[in-house]
UniProtKB/Swiss-Prot annotation:
Lineage of source species: Eukaryota, Fungi, Dikarya, Ascomycota, Saccharomycotina
Species in which this protein is naturally found: Candida glabrata (strain ATCC 2001 / BCRC 20586 / JCM 3761 / NBRC 0622 / NRRL Y-65 / CBS 138) (Yeast)
EC numbers for this chain: 2.7.7.-
Gene3D superfamilies: HUPs
Single GO MF descriptor: tRNA-uridine 2-sulfurtransferase activity
Protein name per the record: Cytoplasmic tRNA 2-thiolation protein 1
Length: 358
């Protein structure tokens, strides 16, 4: 197996060289301090508790049904690589009875996605799992590099997020799969909670903290087995298991708003390690009660309707992906979201999107 040495920093405070014994087995030397609870434990016990906690999450939330096909959203990064490794391991160990498939999205980011997909292909051979790759070029006739060249980098995550979600659904449908699992971890979910709160978008908290999500009328559900896994522990697991993963950050990620929330959370975590789970639980508790609709009120479009342009599920006449594509197509030569003084077609598209429910 080809092993790529991770560039993700393994914090020295988490990897400890102590003469004291593991706090769990009391037989082997402790080599690391768990970021989640600061326990000093040996590698073997870390593997056991990490894998067992994920198994308990799967079982307690009834994530899998025997006989179903499950697509693992595989990017080649640490989260999806550890997810593929663990799900194959637990499926064999606990006999979930599910058929696992790797599903990758090629956004078309030269120097990033092409290299990460090479890692996915190595993992596919190692784990002997089927692999399906769906590209933005094939689905939308655009690549992210082309989109950023026209729309600017500041809103690249908006375009990518909308297109990726739809691409995963379309890829799963192509494979006749109704369940997609992703490597979103506790840090990701806590960051999303913070982002929604900072933007004053409390209405999105319910979906952002749910371990299982599914649009009304859609046969495809998504689940997050890593909901309670700290990112640092995922890195430690990949490090000690010597898993082959791609660790370079997305070319366009530094400009994303998520990075601001991440820095804020890191500062909070340094003071209070439990803040990650605390933030998720706060998000769950802050979920707004659904308003009762007046019996005479009319709703022209709702969940379960289809986009008039592409046929994809949409709560509006035109789905979000098609709205973005229309803006790109109409403003291919001049669109620039970054230019605040020139309210062009792309900016109007973004303002319209902000009024829609994601």
């Amino acid at each position: 197996m080809s092993y790529t040495a991770p560039t993700d920093p393994v914090n020295k405070q988490e990897v400890v060289k102590l003469s004291q014994l593991c706090e769990l087995c009391h037989g082997r030397k402790a080599v690391l301090r768990r970021p989640k609870n600061l326990q000093k434990i040996c590698k073997e016990c870390f593997y056991y508790v990490f894998e067992t906690e994920i198994h308990n999450t799967i079982v307690s939330n009834n994530l899998f049904q025997r006989g179903e096909k499950v697509a693992i959203g595989a990017s080649g990064g640490k989260d999806s690589t550890v997810l593929a490794h663990i799900l194959k391991l637990l499926n064999d160990r606990h006999d979930y009875g599910v058929k696992l498939v790797l599903l990758s999205i090629d956004e078309g980011i030269v120097g990033y996605r092409d290299d990460s997909l090479a890692t996915v292909k190595r993992n596919q051979k190692q784990y002997q799992l089927p692999l399906e790759i769906v590209s933005f070029r094939d689905l939308y006739d655009w690549t992210m590099d082309e989109i950023v060249a026209i729309a600017g980098i500041r809103n690249s995550c908006t375009y990518c997020g909308v297109f990726r979600r739809q691409a995963l659904d379309r890829g799963a449908a192509k494979l006749d799969i109704n369940h997609v699992v992703t490597g979103h971890n506790a840090d990701d979910m806590a960051e999303t909670v913070l982002m929604n709160i900072l933007r004053g978008d409390v209405a999105r908290l319910e979906r952002s903290t749910a371990i299982i999500t599914q649009s009304a009328g859609s046969p495809i559900r998504r689940s997050k087995p890593f909901k309670y896994c700290y990112q640092k522990e995922i890195v430690l697991y990949a490090h000690y298991k010597k898993l082959d993963y791609f660790s370079t950050e997305c070319t366009y990620a530094p400009e994303a708003f998520r990075g601001t929330a991440r820095e804020l959370m890191k500062n909070l975590e340094a003071v209070r390690p439990s803040c990650i789970i605390d933030i998720i639980q706060s998000g769950e508790n802050l979920v707004l009660k659904k308003k009762k609709r007046h019996p005479n009120s009319k709703v022209e479009f709702k969940d379960g309707n289809r986009c008039e342009r592409c046929g994809y599920l949409s709560s509006n006449k035109i789905c979000k992906a098609c709205m973005l594509l229309q803006g790109l197509e109409k403003n291919r030569a001049s669109m620039s979201i970054d230019n605040d003084t020139n309210v062009d077609g792309a900016a109007r598209v973004m303002r319209t999107l902000e009024k829609l429910s994601f």
